[in-house]
Amino acid sequence: MQAQTLHIRHLGMQDYESTWHAMQEYTDTRDSDSQDELWIVEHPPVFTQGQAGKSEHILNPGDIPVIQVDRGGQVTYHGPGQLVVYPLIDIKRNKLGVRQLVNNIEQSIIDMLAYYAINAYAKADAPGVYVTEQKIASLGLRIRKGCSFHGLALNVDMDLAPFQRINPCGYAGLEMVQCKALGGPQTVLEAGDKLIQTFSQIMGYQQLVHHQGLAE
């Protein structure tokens, strides 16, 4: 039976590694009755290298740390002014395949940007969301025990320069773009509020419960 309630945790600015380990712990200890959660967060500057990542795609990290992680995909950058959203979803209970969850996440971003008259789209061969061949959102998931963790990163109002130190998602010369430059949401808070709406609608959640911080 599909969960009707989505619990949303507003985490603010949190370091990447502790958030990642908290996601792992939640996923490893959840059972068939555990609630689905959506974590809303920003991270200090960090490069994360997914399981498909190749070291040659990290060109010049400089003073920004590089963390090897257990999500799908290749290297990406997180930093202040970027909305990061982690869906901790029991896909088995929600009767979703992995591909459908990815499609739903991408569509929730596309729908949110459409609210601002931004024409965004997904690519079948390169997960994420794009505007005129520039990437505005990255996506990388891990499924364990039939449940998802990791998630999406939407560029809102950030310094995009660190993306030039890597081949984003393994694509040399891939240009990044952000919401603020396109007349989209101007703050991470605004983008998060809108994305919560579109994601919950697409996923069919009837009730949203908001929390500040992680569970005690």
UniProtKB/Swiss-Prot annotation:
GO cellular component: cytoplasm
Subcellular location: Cytoplasm
The UniProt record lists the keyword Cytoplasm: yes
Alphabetical UniProt keywords: Acyltransferase, Cytoplasm, Transferase
PANTHER family given in the database record: LIPOYLTRANSFERASE 2, MITOCHONDRIAL-RELATED (PTHR10993:SF7), OCTANOYLTRANSFERASE (PTHR10993)
Protein name (database record): Octanoyltransferase
Function: Catalyzes the transfer of endogenously produced octanoic acid from octanoyl-acyl-carrier-protein onto the lipoyl domains of lipoate-dependent enzymes. Lipoyl-ACP can also act as a substrate although octanoyl-ACP is likely to be the physiological substrate.
Top-level enzyme category: transferase
Reactions listed under catalytic activity: octanoyl-[ACP] + L-lysyl-[protein] = N(6)-octanoyl-L-lysyl-[protein] + holo-[ACP] + H(+)
Residues reported to bind substrate: 71-78, 138-140, 151-153
Active site, per annotation: 169
Enzyme Commission no: 2.3.1.181
Coiled coil: none
Pathway note: Protein modification; protein lipoylation via endogenous pathway; protein N(6)-(lipoyl)lysine from octanoyl-[acyl-carrier-protein]: step 1/2
Keyword match Cytoplasm: yes
